[in-house]
């Protein structure tokens, strides 16, 4: 399907500049790699190229209609969109002020700028001198993580999934950067005055009890290698039940040793033997 046909289905066919830009991005994708390797079909690739072009030209783009047209789920579409952008080397420029206006959190602008400055300084200080020159803080995931943590600090609601979508990253990368930023800039974005262990926080303790083997570093969550308290209690209860049953059986055998030690022998079964058949010969 041609780019112009997809643009017509998304009501974007009137913008000739957008169609030309999307076609240019599609040719760049075809020249650099085979999109089928990352599971992106031709129609989905054309839709994603249109969205990338619309983003760069600051044109309003209906992502819901695009996801429906691509034939993929929203999560799979976002993953393919991010992969395609990274492969062709197109970087999203994320401005703190535009982000604050978009999410309605204008009062966090100054805080976000301070957190980004402190994080960069402290992160570079933790690196060896040979690696400091290669550190890249221009990626939008750092701005998005600082914005989210500052909004959370000031108890402002921000749609996390939408923010991840805007900055063009994955949930795992966003969570990793948020955790690193919280550790290095806890005085700026920390919720409490001091860090607490996961077992001391009721909400986190309940989460660890439910999923002892599948813990994620999400909002307020912490990972731990120890077994949860609920699992330990359950294990102790099972052991106690087993010990009670074992003591009951042992006491029963002590009271009736003959009954307990007597072996049960299966009676032999004697089936009647079949009568031997004799062949009858007829005299001719």
Curated annotation (Swiss-Prot):
One GO MF term attached to the UniProt entry: DNA binding
Metal-binding keyword on record: no
Listed CDD domains: Orc6_mid (cd11583)
A Pfam family hit: ORC6_2nd
Keyword Nucleus part of the UniProt annotation: yes
Keyword terms, alphabetized: DNA replication, DNA-binding, Nucleus
Upregulating conditions: Regulated by E2F. Accumulates rapidly after cell cycle reactivation by sucrose addition following cell cycle arrest mediated by sucrose deprivation.
Coiled coil: none
Alphabetical list of InterPro entries matching this protein: ORC6_cyclin-like_2nd (IPR054113), ORC6_cyclin_first (IPR008721), ORC6_met/pln (IPR020529)
A biological process from GO: DNA replication
Compartment(s) of residence: Nucleus
Gene3D superfamilies on file: Cyclin-like
Similarity annotation: Belongs to the ORC6 family.
Function according to Swiss-Prot or TrEMBL: Component of the origin recognition complex (ORC) that binds origins of replication. DNA-binding is ATP-dependent. The specific DNA sequences that define origins of replication have not been identified yet. ORC is required to assemble the pre-replication complex necessary to initiate DNA replication.
Listed name of the protein: Origin of replication complex subunit 6
Organism: Arabidopsis thaliana (Mouse-ear cress)
Gene: ORC6
């Amino acid at each position: 399907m041609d780019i112009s046909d997809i643009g017509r289905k998304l009501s974007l066919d009137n913008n000739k500049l957008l169609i030309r830009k999307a076609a240019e991005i599609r040719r760049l994708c075809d020249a650099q790699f085979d999109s089928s390797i990352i599971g992106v079909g031709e129609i989905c690739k054309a839709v994603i190229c249109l969205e990338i072009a619309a983003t760069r030209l600051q044109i309003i783009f209906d992502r819901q209609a695009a996801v429906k047209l691509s034939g993929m789920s929203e999560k799979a579409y976002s993953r393919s969109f991010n992969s395609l952008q990274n492969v062709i080397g197109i970087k999203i420029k994320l401005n703190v002020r535009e982000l604050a206006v978009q999410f309605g959190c204008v009062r966090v602008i100054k805080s976000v700028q301070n957190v980004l400055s402190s994080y960069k300084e402290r992160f570079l200080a933790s690196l060896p001198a040979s690696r400091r020159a290669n550190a890249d803080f221009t990626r939008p995931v750092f701005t998005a993580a600082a914005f989210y943590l500052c909004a959370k600090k000031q108890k402002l609601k921000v749609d996390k999934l939408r923010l991840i979508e805007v900055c063009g990253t994955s949930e795992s990368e966003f969570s990793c950067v948020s955790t690193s930023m919280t550790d290095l800039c806890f005085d700026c974005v920390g919720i409490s005055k001091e860090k607490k262990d996961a077992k001391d926080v009721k909400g986190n303790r309940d989460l660890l009890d439910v999923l002892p083997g599948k813990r994620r570093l999400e909002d307020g969550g912490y990972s731990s290698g120890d077994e949860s308290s609920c699992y330990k209690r359950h294990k102790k209860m099972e052991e106690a039940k087993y010990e009670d049953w074992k003591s009951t059986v042992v006491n029963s055998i002590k009271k009736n040793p003959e009954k307990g030690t007597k072996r049960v022998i299966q009676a032999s079964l004697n089936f009647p033997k079949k009568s031997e058949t004799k062949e009858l010969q007829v005299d001719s």
